[in-house]
Swiss-Prot record:
Keyword RNA-binding included in the entry's annotation: no
Gene: stxB2
Annotated signal sequence range: 1-19
Protein's name according to its UniProt entry: Shiga-like toxin 2 subunit B
Effect recorded for A61T: Complete loss of cytotoxicity
GO biological process: symbiont-mediated hemolysis of host erythrocyte; symbiont-mediated modulation of host virulence
Pfam family, one: SLT_beta
Amino acid sequence: MKKMFMAVLFALASVNAMAADCAKGKIEFSKYNEDDTFTVKVDGKEYWTSRWNLQPLLQSAQLTGMTVTIKSSTCESGSGFAEVQFNND
């Protein structure tokens, strides 16, 4: 059981390690999409997410002018993301 737990923990750490910092800045705009995804524009690039738990947090960050860092394994504009870092600067 312990070996299986460690293997899962290592796999999760490996996946998170692959997520690069794609864009850092204030959210320029956000919108809901017809396919139930949510798009934000940061640092001149648009990224979408299907994680509903991130949407109210991203909207709050936009309204308060908080800086965010979008993290993804693909950093091309128009790509998806599942991780965001909220910064206090």
